[in-house]
Amino acid sequence: MTKKIELAQIQVLFLGIWRFLLHLRQRLVEDQINIRAGHLAYVTLLSLVPMVAVTMSMLSAFPVFKGIRGQIEAFVYENFLPAAGDTVQVYINEFVGNASKGTAVGIAALVVVAIMLISAIDKSLNNIWRTKEKRSVVVAFSMYWMVITLGPVLVGASLVATSYVVSLKLFEGDALSGVMPLFIERLPLFFSVAAFLLLYMVVPNQKVKFWHALLGAVVAALLFELGKKGFALYVTKFPSYEAIYGALATIPILFVWVYLSWMIVLLGAEITAAMPEYLDYESSSDINETNLDGQPLAAQDTPAAQPETTSGQSTQVLETTGELAATAPQSTTLDKP
C-alpha cells in the first residue's frame, strides 16, 4: 500500500512538471523570445561602449575603487565574455578612452544610449510579465538613472568585500584551506544568481515572489555558466568564424554570445513569470485526481474544458501536439487566471 502511495505521488509530481513545461513552452512560443533576444543583442552592442564608459566614470569618482578597476575589468571580461574576452577588452578600452575625451554633449549622448539599453530591457521583461500598468516617465527615468549610477558602485563594493574576505587570516587554517579555492571558483555563479534575482524582482512593474524569482535566477545562472564553457569550447575547438572572418571574427563571436546570453536571461524570466500562473491553476484544480493523460480519474470520458481568456492577458494552453502524442495522448489545458 505504501509503495502504491509513493508511486502515485511520483506520478503526480511528474505530471505537474510535465504540465508546467507545456505551459512554459506555450509561453516561449507566444513571446517569441528568440526575436526579443536578437533585438536586445543589437541594442546591447550599440550601447556596450557607452555603458562601459559611464560605468568606469562612476567608479573613478570613488577613490576606493581606483585600485581595483583592473580587477573589475578582468572579472567582467573573463566571466561574461568567454573565449574572445582579451581581444574585446583591448578594443573596448580603446573605444572608451576615445569616448571619455569627448565634449559634454558627447558624454550626454553616451548616457542617453546607455539609458536606451536599460529601457529596452525594462520593456522586454514587462512584456513577459504581461504588465498593463506602465511606469511614469519620471519614475522610469529615476530607475534607469539609479541603475547607471548605483550599479557600478554595488559591483565594485561586492568585489572589494570579496577581496577583504579572501584576505582574512580566519581562512588560513588547515581545516579551511580547501574552502577558499572552492568559494572563489563558485563566485561567478553566486554573482550571476544575485544579478538575475535582482533583475527578475526589481524590473517587472508588479510584485514578484522571492522563491519564483530565485528559481528563475538559479536556472538562468546555471545555463549561463554552462553556456560560457560550451561557447568557449566551440570557439577554441571549431574556429569556423576565424577561418571565415579572419581579423574581424571578434565581431560575430561577440554578437552570437550576447544573443545566447539574452536567450538565457529571457528564459529565466519566462520561468519566473510562468510559476504563479501554473500554481494558480494547480490550486484551482484537483491535480491529484488526474492520471498521466491529464484526465480526471473519475471522469476520463469528460471532454477537456476549454480555456477562458481573461481581459488583458493571453490564454495559456498546455495542449499536446502530434510531437507529444506518444507521451501524452490526451490534450491538457491550463486556464490562466
Curated annotation (Swiss-Prot):
Domain of life (superkingdom): Bacteria
Alphabetical UniProt keywords: Cell inner membrane, Cell membrane, Membrane, Transmembrane, Transmembrane helix
Protein location: Cell inner membrane
Membrane topology field: Multi-pass membrane protein
Residue ranges, compositional bias (Polar residues): 307-319, 328-337
HAMAP family: UPF0761 (MF_00672)
Entries under PANTHER family matching the protein: INNER MEMBRANE PROTEIN YHJD, UPF0761 MEMBRANE PROTEIN YIHY
Family note: Belongs to the UPF0761 family.
Protein name: UPF0761 membrane protein Shewmr4_0316
Organism: Shewanella sp. (strain MR-4)
